[in-house]
From Swiss-Prot:
Residue ranges of the TM segments: none
Residues the entry annotates as binding ATP: 86-96
Primary localization: cytoplasm
HAMAP family: Shik_kinase_arch
Protein name, UniProt field: Shikimate kinase
Known EC number: 2.7.1.71
Enzyme class label: transferase
Cited InterPro entries: GHMP_kinase_C_dom, GHMP_kinase_C_sf, GHMP_kinase_N_dom, Ribosomal_Su5_D2-typ_SF, Ribsml_uS5_D2-typ_fold_subgr, SK_arc
GO MF terms, alphabetically ordered: ATP binding; shikimate kinase activity
Pfam families associated with the record: GHMP_kinases_C, GHMP_kinases_N
One term under GO cellular component: cytoplasm
Keywords: Amino-acid biosynthesis, Aromatic amino acid biosynthesis, ATP-binding, Cytoplasm, Kinase, Nucleotide-binding, Transferase
SUPFAM superfamilies xref list: GHMP Kinase, C-terminal domain, Ribosomal protein S5 domain 2-like
Gene that encodes it: aroK
Length: 283
């Protein structure tokens, strides 16, 4: 009983921590999960990250365990993950890993794939591993479905699905700043994040992303000038991704090199593009 599945990384448009409402978009970077099940009644689950062997496999092991418990089987399992989403890049590698792990386990069991079940079990696993504050339903759905999702994270509802109408690039900056997840400070900017979310729900994703980035970078003491530097170099929009320290900038292909040069003085960069091809079983 084997199965392989992939799920996307995602970038932030609106961080949901302040208000419970968020938005994210799928990017063309993926994590693949390979699951092998053994019907031996022992419930032994072992995981490994092929591309990053030092990474603890506890999240994907938890995903497999939760799927097996849901379907009330006592199989053992091996799970390996491999992908091109940089860890701690602000591109929702944990959402991608958990989605892929759950999907591959369901596939290995030969059960019917139900999107709501995949997302629920993936988010449950992330909560249990203390990897999320809000459940990150926006990140999880953008990773799973691709495109843009606008969500009520508290109720786990997708309010709107969309996609970028233009052919654009995504440049991710990964500076060596110390991560800061001060929930109390993020709650202070709630009313202003609401204003950015209004732009988002109206379909003005570029302005929403930029405003969100300014607000959260201010609350978390990350430099806001980085986003402005990206605009100066030709980016359409730019802002903090998630709770940082990474930033994302969106630009047209002809401005890609200028924007990357403006950002890479702050740290490593990765260039990708939005994706509407969501999670899927490979074989």
């Amino acid at each position: 009983m084997r199965c392989s599945a992939v799920s996307l990384g995602s970038g932030t448009i609106i961080n949901a921590i302040a208000t419970g409402f968020g938005s994210a978009f799928g990017v063309d970077l993926k994590i693949k999960a390979d699951v092998e099940l053994v019907d031996n009644g022992k419930k032994i689950i072992n995981g490994i990250s092929i591309d990053n062997p030092t990474l603890k496999p506890s999240l994907v092991e938890r995903c497999v365990k939760n799927v097996l418990n849901y379907f009330e089987v006592d199989y053992s399992a091996k799970i390996s993950t491999n992908g091109d989403i940089p860890i701690k890049s602000g591109l929702s590698s944990s959402s991608a890993a958990s989605n892929a792990a759950v999907l591959a386990t369901i596939g290995a069991l030969g059960e019917k794939v139900d999107s709501d079940l995949v997302l629920d079990l993936a988010i449950k696993s992330s909560f249990e591993e203390k990897l999320t504050v809000t459940g990150a339903y926006d990140d999880a759905t953008a990773s799973y479905f691709g495109g843009i999702t606008v969500c009520n994270n508290m109720e786990r509802k997708i309010l709107k699905k969309d996609e970028f109408k233009e052919d654009i690039k995504v440049i991710v900056l990964m500076p060596e700043f110390e991560k800061n997840v001060d929930v109390n400070r993020m709650k202070l900017i709630k009313d202003y994040v609401d204003m950015a979310f209004e732009k988002c729900i109206a379909g003005d994703y570029y302005k929403a992303l930029f405003l969100n980035g300014l607000l959260y970078s201010s609350a978390l003491n990350f430099p806001s000038n980085i986003s402005v530097d990206a605009l100066e170099a030709g980016a359409i929009t730019a802002g903090l991704s998630g709770t940082g320290p990474s930033y994302v900038a969106l630009c047209y292909s002809e401005d890609e090199k200028n924007v990357e040069n403006a950002l890479k003085k702050y740290g490593n960069t990765v260039i990708t593009k939005p994706s509407t091809n969501g999670a899927r079983i490979l074989y």
